[in-house]
Amino acid sequence: MEPWSSRWKTKRWLWDFTVTTLALTFLFQAREVRGAAPVDVLKALDFHNSPEGISKTTGFCTNRKNSKGSDTAYRVSKQAQLSAPTKQLFPGGTFPEDFSILFTVKPKKGIQSFLLSIYNEHGIQQIGVEVGRSPVFLFEDHTGKPAPEDYPLFRTVNIADGKWHRVAISVEKKTVTMIVDCKKKTTKPLDRSERAIVDTNGITVFGTRILDEEVFEGDIQQFLITGDPKAAYDYCEHYSPDCDSSAPKAAQAQEPQIDEYAPEDIIEYDYEYGEAEYKEAESVTEGPTVTEETIAQTEANIVDDFQEYNYGTMESYQTEAPRHVSGTNEPNPVEEIFTEEYLTGEDYDSQRKNSEDTLYENKEIDGRDSDLLVDGDLGEYDFYEYKEYEDKPTSPPNEEFGPGVPAETDITETSINGHGAYGEKGQKGEPAVVEPGMLVEGPPGPAGPAGIMGPPGLQGPTGPPGDPGDRGPPGRPGLPGADGLPGPPGTMLMLPFRYGGDGSKGPTISAQEAQAQAILQQARIALRGPPGPMGLTGRPGPVGGPGSSGAKGESGDPGPQGPRGVQGPPGPTGKPGKRGRPGADGGRGMPGEPGAKGDRGFDGLPGLPGDKGHRGERGPQGPPGPPGDDGMRGEDGEIGPRGLPGEAGPRGLLGPRGTPGAPGQPGMAGVDGPPGPKGNMGPQGEPGPPGQQGNPGPQGLPGPQGPIGPPGEKGPQGKPGLAGLPGADGPPGHPGKEGQSGEKGALGPPGPQGPIGYPGPRGVKGADGVRGLKGSKGEKGEDGFPGFKGDMGLKGDRGEVGQIGPRGEDGPEGPKGRAGPTGDPGPSGQAGEKGKLGVPGLPGYPGRQGPKGSTGFPGFPGANGEKGARGVAGKPGPRGQRGPTGPRGSRGARGPTGKPGPKGTSGGDGPPGPPGERGPQGPQGPVGFPGPKGPPGPPGKDGLPGHPGQRGETGFQGKTGPPGPGGVVGPQGPTGETGPIGERGHPGPPGPPGEQGLPGAAGKEGAKGDPGPQGISGKDGPAGLRGFPGERGLPGAQGAPGLKGGEGPQGPPGPVGSPGERGSAGTAGPIGLPGRPGPQGPPGPAGEKGAPGEKGPQGPAGRDGVQGPVGLPGPAGPAGSPGEDGDKGEIGEPGQKGSKGDKGENGPPGPPGLQGPVGAPGIAGGDGEPGPRGQQGMFGQKGDEGARGFPGPPGPIGLQGLPGPPGEKGENGDVGPMGPPGPPGPRGPQGPNGADGPQGPPGSVGSVGGVGEKGEPGEAGNPGPPGEAGVGGPKGERGEKGEAGPPGAAGPPGAKGPPGDDGPKGNPGPVGFPGDPGPPGEPGPAGQDGVGGDKGEDGDPGQPGPPGPSGEAGPPGPPGKRGPPGAAGAEGRQGEKGAKGEAGAEGPPGKTGPVGPQGPAGKPGPEGLRGIPGPVGEQGLPGAAGQDGPPGPMGPPGLPGLKGDPGSKGEKGHPGLIGLIGPPGEQGEKGDRGLPGTQGSPGAKGDGGIPGPAGPLGPPGPPGLPGPQGPKGNKGSTGPAGQKGDSGLPGPPGSPGPPGEVIQPLPILSSKKTRRHTEGMQADADDNILDYSDGMEEIFGSLNSLKQDIEHMKFPMGTQTNPARTCKDLQLSHPDFPDGEYWIDPNQGCSGDSFKVYCNFTSGGETCIYPDKKSEGVRISSWPKEKPGSWFSEFKRGKLLSYLDVEGNSINMVQMTFLKLLTASARQNFTYHCHQSAAWYDVSSGSYDKALRFLGSNDEEMSYDNNPFIKTLYDGCASRKGYEKTVIEINTPKIDQVPIVDVMINDFGDQNQKFGFEVGPVCFLG
């Protein structure tokens, strides 16, 4: 055969020739390619010599034209093991790049296995053809392409249907086409390299893959590989024609006499494979007679297929499988099921276990010991070969296979089959160019989300009995047989494949070695040699330890069914048979009566967009739209006509003071006036002579904190101090970074004997061993399953009526009766005392979205918009209406100096002057007497509900109620008496297959078999001790499949199952019919702002509007003129402070005082010791309905509701607001002269009149409204301090403002003396509005008033941001203890005071960064002895004295003063890096560094500090005193204060322009600005990290690193999460102790944990050695029930406690399987005496007689007849009762009694 590459060489040579040469060469080329003989695989593998496992059979045609007989084919059985070197098939050494694979095959029905596998020299599979229900073409070239997930899978093809199929596969360029039976053609993409190379240096295996257990079984007639990709299209014409055509010379290529194709035979065929047929992609073109075989499969076959074809695991076994099989054009249901189960990597077994339709009765299947599970090589098969053929993201293999991968299989690290690790995902490819024949449909998308569960339908009538099911799945394989006798030693074979990694790790097994061992195993089996010579004697192994006793083996397999015996006489009446499986679903019942109206459903999803409607009619005139944005300024219009004169403006401000006029003539001497007010303080006099030495003054208040002094020089080394007490353990530091790998340590001593390793992967089947000796007789097996139900006896005679039985015990307490009529209201109780302020509750869950709130206050005006572009000049507008009153005019210009006025008359007595300035605060007054008794407080809150009262006496018997609804079908009645023997009936039909019988007697010993081939000698194992005799015998050979049984009788209806877990989401159903219109939906969200409507007509005048809210403060007014200097007051003499009097004797006790106001909260006490645990309280009655809580924050916006029905016509609305003025109408005609109009507005200002005579002084006007605040005037001269004014009355408390932003924390102020509480003034009546007076000038700001009366302590506010720590204050002297004053109202912030005394110890904060150690100060000189000072700081601890007697516990002392700082200790070890510390004091300015790069834009800085108070202005002139007005309402907010000083922005936060300016300022102002850039990025990074952490705390994700508290929390945070497994951490500490649970969101967010493997339950048994009435944990095989998380780990006790604290109720199911044993109610005795008893987690026994929260969902064991079960549910609000940890069984011990049970999960609902 010529090399395949010659075809390409020839093609390159063709370009240089003419058209004639081109045509000739093409014909030659065709002869050359087509003439190359196909590779006959069957011939190369020696099929015609019928090797082991291969036999000849009838082929595709039983009678072929022009042939003597039928086609010849070969039957391949499981014993066939055929392989050959690939070069034997391709002697030229090259595999064609484009090729066809042609085969005619009839696989065994339902099989899925590889027909051919080609491996390279490294053992990697390059080509594989897998046939079965969904054929797969595996291809991997030398570059590893395509990836396993891209292997072509032909889902629409089923070859394993038990029929002959002619299959042709064409591989050309990057597509692969499969043609089945010459009709069905499917094309898939094949993403391989441009020059894909297939290595021929390996081996080719037929019928399987290396290390694969699935083996091809079936018939094959032909298997060819040819280098022509077009040959696949002519397979049915030239290679395997129909039966009515004669076979070509090479049709049955397996015959030995046909060696090769004659070129002349092949060249005659005209290859008409048109482009049209080849270009179709994924389309399936087939004739009308071809049907999809898969559609006809029944459901049972589908299930069968699943069991046989367990590739991996099923993700949604019980939910995705459709329950019907149809022949319509739906997607093929079988294909869908298979795709799901075949492709996903989830754990098949765990899903099957949770399913209600279990395929296996055996409950003990799980991921650890089930034979169904994939083992190591199968897991590798899934991951390496198939993974997922859908476009789903694939999870890492260790997640996909879970426990299915053995412990020693590390898929992610060790390469599989010699592969390297997968590379990173490549970049996105170029856009595809769709060529003809290249378009491939993608796989169907994943199923849509589950729809909302519909309401349950009415129960249909019982359906007809179902058809008998197919044969059940095959049983689990038997235990492995006993080891054969050791074979003779073989030859030694050294493999140089083991090579170690680095020096620190033992030898690893390489992929090459594993592959080589497999290839050698194949070669060894295929080329079995003669027995080798005797091997070397191995060294004796160490003596093994005694093995543990083996577990008792399971019962043996049932023996073959014996011949049917003669029918005996009818036996006694049999026990009722086991409940049959549920029949098939009945036909659809008649529609039931309409049910009651259901609750309102959730808002549906938004509907599909409807068709575009017709254009609507023009709607009515809309209301005027909102004002539009400011347009661009238009050009100046034409000047309009002069407007009408406006109304007179308000009175202007006072003009500036005129210049003094000329002096008038002296007037008459006036009458002496009354003495004037006291003048202002005179100027400071000269200092007097020094006075005598005064008495020492009282101790002054501590001064303010001085600045930090410069560091002193280092002092001498002090003596080492005494060792301090050991500090409390600090919080754990953050985990450090991972250190570098250390050097390899020295070889340690040999470790102890390790545990027995996990079983290795399943080996290749060994050769048959020599038959062993006959074993000893086994022990008696366990009871077999009960026999079949006997034939039904004749009906007995009716028994006599029995006597009336004794009166039964009192039944259980009935359900709570309906509520009686409401009683008369009781007498009103006395008013309770006012309760204390409660502790704020935990934050509630966010409520549902509240109704739309009322309109908020008007917002602040927005910022000015950008200037618009210049508009077009407008037309001159119409003459406008008369404008409103103009604003108050600005202050007029200064007028001319007036003429000297005439002489004035003598003035009258002036009014009394205004009160003087407020004096300083007086000294603190004495403590007042107790006030009078206050009025009785409001009634207190209702008390807690009392304990439930004792049970009341039995009430009178009620009237007979109406007949109740039909009861449940009662249990089966007692067995009747045996009837007489009937006549012998006709032989019945064959019964259903019997349940497992007792093992048959041992057969005779067979003849000794031929000795098997010599095996390879195993390694010498250690000599084990003699094992105990095994119980289970060798498994029998697999029997032939039995015939399908006849139809079984209909079983009784099955019990109600316990509620199953929620299935996964089904596919979205079709859109249903439109429902009846629902109620009107809630108002939708506000729509987007509509476009402004057209201008409507002018509306009628609206009603008077409600008075608007107080407006915003106006801008600052213009500056006032400077006032004249006021008179100075006299200096008052301060009185001397009296000395403290002697302490008086104790007076007689006074009468008890009235209850004082609530005191200020005291200092936080230390943590108390936890008290003893209280007993579980009684279950209280339901409390009264609580007060409505505060509205929660708005919930998320719901889905768009469906449009509601049109509402009824509304009533006439109020008259709308006045519309905007309409456009000017046309000019009307000249009207007649009108009548005299009303008085016109005042005319314009007249000319200035002459100066009139001075009028008489007018009476004082009413006080005018407060004027606007003026701008601060220039600083006046400092006036003398006035006398102290009387304290003002306390103002009414203002309304509580909204909480402001956290300001920067100020320095702590000094501790002031407690002020006297001001008496609360009674609110005066609201006065009438006064007449507006002239604007008054600003008064000086008053001194802060004394503190107001104490308000009640409010709830604790939100925690403020942490401020910087204050500097340590100087020690103050100990003051005298004053009486406790009442808490004052919140005063203005005080000045900075000294640091207060030490508070109680706070909780340990986060560990800060270690600060820079300060320099040690010098030791000062001793000062002179002063007066006795306050107690000094605590000295160093003395030497420990003798231990005294324990004294009584004293009262808690006052906090002590801060001790002196001790000398510095020795430098400790370097600590872990702490959190960032507080900012240190600024250091000296360093040298200027190089300007750094611009940092990121920081957040906006804090608001600036308030500016300094402006200088006091000059005193204004005294105005006339007005009459005192009534107290007015609180005024509007004051005008804005002066702007604060701008703190220099940080360079890192400012723009470039500002930063350059700042740097220039830095150059000018030397040391003003610190370098803040260091550490800012770290701070912002920390803030961002904190923000993310807080987000995760608020909305946890349920992952291991971000767990939720409970599943309920997770549902509230993410209501769209599906049911499944999530991580929770109930105690919310470090997430390291979180654990994984199952969250059942369908049931409201339940948190479910499961019992462990040994606590799940026990199989039904008679338990002969156990006593009734004992706990299961006391049984020989019993134990306390324990529970695990989903990962199989035990749950921390603390976590369990927290989970219960967060739970409101919990539930758990318990299923009791019985045979003649009662579980709850006993029908025979009519009592609950034999009811099960459960032991709760709180050691409380629970049963029927003491726990009302236990009920039975189904009680089949009550009749004590036959096999039944009882399902018990514990649903309790007493969380400590579950999960149950033990169960007491009372009804067993008789010979026929048996029981078993299953324990369900416990689910907590928060």
Curated annotation (Swiss-Prot):
SUPFAM superfamilies per the record?
Concanavalin A-like lectins/glucanases
CC terms in the record's Gene Ontology section: collagen type XI trimer; collagen-containing extracellular matrix; endoplasmic reticulum lumen; extracellular region; extracellular space
Allysine: residues bearing it: K612, K1452
Q: Region (Nonhelical region (C-terminal)) spans which residues?
A: 1543-1563
Q: How is it modified after translation?
A: Prolines at the third position of the tripeptide repeating unit (G-X-Y) are hydroxylated in some or all of the chains.
- Glycosylation site list: N1640
State where it is primarily located: secreted
Cellular compartment(s): Secreted, Extracellular space, Extracellular matrix
An individual GO BP term: detection of mechanical stimulus involved in sensory perception of sound
Span of the signal peptide: 1-35
Q: Which InterPro entries match?
A: Collagen, Collagen_superfamily, ConA-like_dom_sf, Fib_collagen_C, Laminin_G, TSPN-like_N
Q: Which residues does the UniProt record annotate as the domain Fibrillar collagen NC1? A: 1577-1805
Q: In which tissues is it expressed?
A: Cartilage, placenta and some tumor or virally transformed cell lines. Isoforms using exon IIA or IIB are found in the cartilage while isoforms using only exon IIB are found in the tendon.
Family, per entry: Belongs to the fibrillar collagen family.
Name of the molecule in the record = Collagen alpha-1(XI) chain
The species this protein was found in? Homo sapiens (Human)
Q: Which gene encodes it?
A: COL11A1
